[in-house]
């Protein structure tokens, strides 16, 4: 009976508390906050805050902005939103708090400053939050392939292949196996030929992290490739808590990479051989065409040689005729020379004859004058005779 009364009392108290919490509100200006619902409400690092507020319904449909300020009053984030039909502003998981402990300020403002409200939240860490890194959540991949990794007694050992990109992933949890957001994870490695390399990141909201680094291949000669050691440390920090793990990574020869490289070379050679075969086939075709052309040319040369032979024969005949003509020419030249001499003599004789003709013409001219005088005298004498005869005849009659 006592147990039943106690249970009933506890239930009533729980219901009262739930009712109290569910109806808690905080008003600032003309903005009523339902989440956060209490000024200086506590939020843990890595947790998100949902903004649930109400402004006068007259501002329904207008734009609004949610501003979050760091403890030092600098702006951390500005989230635009819109007032719904009932005057509500609701943004689930609006912002996840990073590892910045202190009093944050959240303001809700309708565009134009017609409605403004402010509420403070206390961002802190859980009272006890030791960091542990569990083995089952630690993994390593290289070029998308999972690699061997082991975590025991604060030492991380793994085996990777050379000449690849390694991604190491894991989760950071607190003592209650809850994910920690905003924890810093740093990986420091001493890599041969590279030196000391430090990588750093922060965990996501689910406590996950990933770091990437390159594993060099010290030699490209297959017979000289051998394993080597990469040593270093992995440090996880969250608030005042820090834990460090030793890291030993054995980089073994990446024969798969070498084989792939050789396969690529073989593929390249095959491609080149195929191209050469194509070129050879083209050259053979060109050679066949050239042989055909050569055969045609040889046939044409044979024909030309035959024609040249005929031409040579013709030339020989013409040479003979030319010799004969040359002899005749020489003979004719001699005759022409002789004729030229005769013509010269004839020219001389002709000149003499021309002189004689000129003299004769002069003589003939003189004789012609005398002859014309004699003729005229004869005619006159004849006329006189005729007249005398006529006169005699008249007398007789």
Curated annotation (Swiss-Prot):
Residues 259-314 form a coiled coil. It is a single-pass membrane protein. It is found in: Secreted, Cell wall, S-layer; Cell membrane. It comes from the Archaea. Residues 1-24 form the signal peptide. Induction: Constitutively expressed. Keywords: Cell membrane, Cell wall, Coiled coil, Membrane, S-layer, Secreted, Signal, Transmembrane, Transmembrane helix. SUPFAM superfamilies: Bacterial hemolysins (SSF58100). The chain crosses the membrane at residues 373-393. One of its GO terms (cellular component) is extracellular region. Belongs to the Sulfolobales SlaB family. The mushroom-shaped unit cells of the Sulfolobales' S-layers may consist of three SlaB subunits and six SlaA subunits. S-layer small protein. May anchor the complex to the cell membrane. Composed of consecutive beta sandwich domains, a coiled-coil domain and a C-terminal transmembrane helix. This is S-layer protein B. It comes from Saccharolobus solfataricus (strain ATCC 35092 / DSM 1617 / JCM 11322 / P2).
């Amino acid at each position: 009976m006592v147990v039943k009364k106690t249970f009933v009392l506890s239930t009533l108290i729980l219901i009262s508390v739930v009712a109290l919490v569910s109806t808690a509100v905080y008003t600032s200006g003309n903005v009523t906050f339902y989440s956060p619902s209490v000024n200086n409400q506590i939020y843990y690092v890595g947790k998100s805050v949902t903004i649930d507020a109400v402004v006068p319904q007259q501002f329904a449909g207008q734009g609004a902005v949610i501003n979050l300020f760091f403890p030092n009053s600098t702006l951390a984030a500005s989230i635009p939103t819109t007032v719904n039909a009932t005057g509500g502003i609701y943004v689930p998981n609006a912002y996840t708090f990073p590892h910045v402990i202190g009093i944050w300020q959240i303001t809700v403002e309708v565009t134009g400053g017609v409605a403004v409200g402010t509420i403070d939240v206390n961002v802190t860490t859980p009272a006890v939050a030791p960091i542990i890194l569990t083995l089952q959540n630690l993994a390593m991949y290289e070029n998308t392939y999972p690699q061997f990794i082991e975590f025991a007694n604060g030492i991380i050992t793994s085996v990777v292949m050379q000449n690849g990109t390694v991604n190491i992933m894991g989760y950071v949890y607190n003592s209650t196996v809850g994910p920690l957001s905003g924890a810093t994870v740093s990986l420091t490695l001493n890599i041969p030929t590279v030196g000391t390399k430090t990588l750093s990141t922060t965990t996501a909201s689910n406590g996950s992290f990933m770091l990437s680094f390159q594993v060099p291949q010290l030699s490209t000669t297959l017979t000289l490739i051998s394993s080597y050691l990469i040593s270093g440390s992995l440090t996880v920090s969250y608030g005042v808590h820090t834990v460090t793990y030793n890291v030993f990574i054995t980089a073994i020869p990446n024969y798969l990479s070498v084989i792939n490289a050789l396969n690529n070379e073989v593929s390249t050679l095959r491609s080149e051989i195929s191209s050469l075969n194509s070129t050879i086939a083209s050259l053979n075709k060109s050679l066949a065409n050239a042989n055909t052309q050569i055969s045609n040319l040889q046939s044409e040369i044979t024909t030309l040689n035959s024609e040249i032979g005929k031409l040579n024969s013709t030339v020989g005949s013409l040479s003979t005729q030319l010799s004969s003509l040359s002899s005749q020419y020489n003979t004719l030249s001699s005759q022409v020379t002789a004729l030229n001499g005769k013509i010269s003599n004839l020219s001389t004789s002709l000149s003499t004859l021309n002189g004689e003709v000129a003299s004769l013409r002069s003589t003939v001219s003189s004789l012609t004058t005398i002859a014309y005088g004699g003729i005229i005298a004869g005619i006159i004498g004849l006329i006189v005779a005729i007249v005398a005869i006529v006169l005699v005849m008249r007398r007789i009659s």
